Each structure stands twice: as structure tokens, then as C-alpha cells.
Amino acid sequence: MFEKISQFLVPIAGRLNNNRYLQVLRDAFMLAFPLTIFGSIFVVLTNLPFLNKIMNASMLTSFQSHFGIASTATMGIMSVFVVFGIGYYLSKSYQVEAVFGGAIALVSFLLLTPFIIQPETGDAITGVIPVDRLGAKGMFLGMITAFLSGEIYRRIVQKNLTIKMPAGVPPAVAKSFAALIPAFITLTVFLLINVMVTLFFKTNMHDVIYHAIQAPLVGLGSGIIPTLIAVFFIQILWFFGLHGQIIINSVMDPIWNTLQVENLSAYTAGKEIPHIISKPFMEIYTVGMGGTGMTLAIVFTILIFMKSRQMKQVSKLGLAPGIFNVNEPIIFGLPIVMNPIIIVPWVLAPMVVTLVTYLAMSAGLVPPPTGVTVPWTVPLFINGIMATNSIMGGVMQLINLLIVFVIWFPFLKAMDKLNLAKEKEQAVQETAAQQNDNSIKM
């Protein structure tokens, strides 16, 4: 049965993993990763719960105002980095000049962005870009624009509709002239789109895409049922030896990252955090507990309660990496991959933990993640506190470890008995072989 399922899943997962556009999207978000880490660090520092006890109100306001710009300049305009990254990596995948692909994508996005702010009272302010258009609110338009502009740009380049300079011209100058016609045509397309939408429909592409595509998708992706489905497929893919995170996250990351940016914007503005499900939720309360499947609980269970020598050796090897959320020694050494004995807890435990965590946050027992990006190698409990800015975030992880322990224990016990029987049989065979060798020598 497992072989038939594997034969069905592996080709699909392979196509998803090798899809050009999903790879580009993943790389584009990783381009923004170090910048979001920088911004997140200062969000944590400016919102430490004890600051109001060591600073007066005026000093605290000044501190948050001066250092809070770090999150606005990174997480607050994340769409800018993603758009450039998509244009860059898409062009690179087609082996055309990547830097110009990124720059053209970014300008195409800006051409569709309204340079106007309408205050609640007073006249509109022109010549400025609302920051929210460059953050979560503009994410989906940015991605769509970047892919379209990248495709237009590379097709024009590949058709040789470029200006070719003499051989003696410096390479930088030659490349600039080569990109001139593709850039002009691509940018003209998006300029005309903006003109038509503005003149004939009295709106802008940001609002069109946000209301027609982004809001429905984000609303769907923030629900617990789609999240549980995503967790289910992540675990199933890992069971068959495929990297579930890379495959599923390449589809879900645009939604989860958008939710994260919206949460951070609300948090830094002092508003209620709107979403429970987001990228940090998925990383901290699934991967951030010893790696995929929360295997740190499995390691502790084996070391404390199991007797099999093989299982204990694997767990000892997996303990140190597991503290930093690296669990390949457990997945492939225990093994978990293609092991029918433990497919049930492997799939069930993360889904139960995800549901329990969601319900605890919905009930207000644990604050939801604030939107800060916590490096995935930060150990358990610490990453929970950092993600939620509350000790309850870490406590929730400890409770989740107990849940994983309860679900896994009977299955590990069964596996332990089987391994003990094999080890005893192997020991008997080795003893018999040694006695046989001794008798031959005598």
C-alpha cells in the first residue's frame, strides 16, 4: 500500500518542488529573510515587557520611535524586496540579465501603486506612497506583477529585441543599452494598465487585486481547517522521504507571510493582532519544537522510557541537533521514513498540537505570534517567548511536548519491543557464532 501511495505522491511532489515559479517565489522570500530578522530583533527589543519599569513614559516613547523605524524599513515594505527578488530570480532562471529583471519588476509594481494618501479628514496628499501598499496589502499584486513583468522582459530579450553595442564598449554600458528596449516595452505595458484602471474604473490595481484575490485567499489560509490540511500533507510527504516543508510552504508561504506582516503592522501600531495562523505560528509551534513532527519529545521519550539500544543510540545522536530544530538523524535514523508502525503518531501529533495551540490562542490563554521573524534554529521555549513576547508562548510549547509524548508513547513502546526482540535474537546469534569459532580453534 505504501509503495502505491509513494508512486502516486513522489511524481507530484517532484513537479511541485521543481516548478520554476515556486522555486523563484521561495528564493524571493529568502532574499527578504535577513532583512526581516533585522527588523524583528528591534521589534522585540522595543516591546520588551519590562521597559515601562526602567524608563519613564517620555523616554519609552522616544526609544520606540527611534528604533521602531527598523521594522518599518524592513517588514513594513516587504513587498518591495519580494518583487525585486521574483524579478531577479525569474530572469536568472531564464539566463537573462537578472539585475535588470529585478529592477524592471520593482518599477512595474510602483507604476501600479497610487502615489496618494487620503486622510480621514482633509484633502488628499499626492506625491507620497502609503507604506501599507509596500507591505502586506500589496503583497499579492507585487507577486503577480513581478512574474508578469519578468516573463515579458525575458521574452523580449530572448527574441533579441535589444540594442547591441560595439565590442569595445564597457560591459556595464552594453548591458544597460541591451536592457533599454525590453525595459521600455515592459514598463509601458504596466503604465497603460494603470492608466486604464484609473481612468475607466476610477480605482487602482492595488484595491482590485486586494479585494478580488488577496483578501479571500488570506481569509481562507488563516483558517484552522486549511492549516490542518497543510500540516497533514507536510507530515505525509516527510513520511515518504520528501521535504514536506519545502513543497507545501512554496504554495502556502505567500499567504502565511502576508498574515505575518499584517500581524506585525498591527502589533507595532499597538492594535490587536488580527490573525492566529501566520508564518511564525507554523514555524514556532510545529518546526520549532525539535524539527518537523516535534521530534524533540520523541527523543526525550526514548531516552527516558525505552530500552532498545538502537533507539537510544539514534536518540543520543539526535538530541543535540534536535535542540536547534534539526531532526534528520531521527527522521532517517529511527527511522520515521516509510515506517508503518509510527505513521499514525507522526501525522496525528502535529495536527493535534496545531489545533490545541490554535484553540488556546483563540481563547486568549496564549497570545498569538506578534509577527516577528524568529530564526528557526532558536531552541524550544526561547523561540516561543520571542514569537509571542510572552512567557505563555514558551509554556504552550511545553504543554505541546506533553501532548506529543502521550500520542507517541504507545507506538514507541511497540517499536521498542520489536527492536528488543531483534537485538536479543542478534545477540544469541553472535554468541552462537563466537562459541562456534572457539570450538573450531580448540
From Swiss-Prot:
How does this protein lie in the membrane? Multi-pass membrane protein
Give GO MF terms, alphabetically. protein-N(PI)-phosphohistidine-sugar phosphotransferase activity
What cellular component terms from Gene Ontology apply here? plasma membrane
Q: Which UniProt keywords apply?
A: Cell membrane, Membrane, Phosphotransferase system, Polysaccharide transport, Sugar transport, Transmembrane, Transmembrane helix, Transport
List the GO biological process terms. Answer: carbohydrate derivative transport; phosphoenolpyruvate-dependent sugar phosphotransferase system; polysaccharide transport
| Subcellular localization | Cell membrane
Keyword Ubl conjugation attributed: no
User: Which protein is depicted?
Assistant: PTS system oligo-beta-mannoside-specific EIIC component
Domain PTS EIIC type-3 residues, every copy:
5-411
Induction per UniProt is:
Up-regulated by konjac glucomannan and by cellobiose and mannobiose, the possible degradation products of glucomannan. Repressed by glucose via the carbon catabolite repression system. Also repressed by GmuR.
Q: Which domain of life is it from?
A: Bacteria
UniProt xrefs under NCBIfam families: cello_pts_IIC (TIGR00359), lacE (TIGR00410)
Q: Which InterPro entries match?
A: PTS_EIIC, PTS_EIIC_3, PTS_IIC_cello, PTS_Sugar-EIIC/EIIB
Provide the transmembrane region boundaries. 28-48, 67-87, 97-117, 138-157, 177-197, 205-225, 228-248, 286-306, 329-349, 365-385, 391-411
Could you tell me which species this protein originates from? Bacillus subtilis (strain 168)
Whether Transmembrane helix counts among this entry's keywords is yes
Give the comment on domains. Answer: The EIIC type-3 domain forms the PTS system translocation channel and contains the specific substrate-binding site.
The protein's role, per its UniProt record: The phosphoenolpyruvate-dependent sugar phosphotransferase system (sugar PTS), a major carbohydrate active transport system, catalyzes the phosphorylation of incoming sugar substrates concomitantly with their translocation across the cell membrane. The enzyme II GmuABC PTS system is involved in the transport of oligo-glucomannans such as cellobiose or mannobiose.
